[in-house]
């Protein structure tokens, strides 16, 4: 459904959760299926966690998933990765803000400016990952 047709928080939750789970899974598969640029991106990294979290009703990890990258290998997962701190954390402040950024109602940089999302950690690698997310989204449209 388009974002403006979502009637309640349950529908918003479902769309955001599915979107983030698909994004992290797609990023991992993009590496495993052999994209040369993504493989190089993963190969040159030690063990790193790219964490995605959506805050709702005061709960900072209401929705959470991650991409783990280590020496050319990648794995996606649900929840907060607890064995180490994230190398990059994409923190969305609300379901509505996450919907706007993930639904491309606003670009990621604009979402940061408007307070929908913040990135904590390496800005350079956050940009790299955002570029790969844009490539994957382009494949779907």
PLM features: what roles do these ranges have?
Residues 1-141:
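Feature captures hydrophobic
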């Amino acid at each position: 459904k388009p974002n403006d047709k979502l009637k309640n928080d349950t529908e918003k939750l479902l769309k955001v959760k599915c979107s983030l789970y698909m994004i992290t899974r797609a990023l991992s598969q993009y590496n495993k299926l052999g994209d040369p640029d993504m493989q190089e991106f993963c190969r040159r990294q030690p063990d790193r966690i790219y964490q995605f979290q959506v805050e709702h009703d005061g709960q900072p990890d209401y929705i959470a998933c991650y991409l783990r990258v280590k020496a050319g290998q990648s794995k996606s997962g649900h929840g907060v990765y607890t064995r180490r701190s994230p190398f990059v954390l994409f923190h969305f402040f609300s379901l509505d803000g996450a919907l706007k950024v993930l639904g491309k109602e606003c670009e990621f940089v604009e979402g940061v400016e408007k307070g929908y999302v913040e990135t904590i950690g390496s800005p350079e690698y956050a940009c790299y990952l955002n570029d790969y997310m844009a490539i994957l989204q382009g494949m779907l449209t």
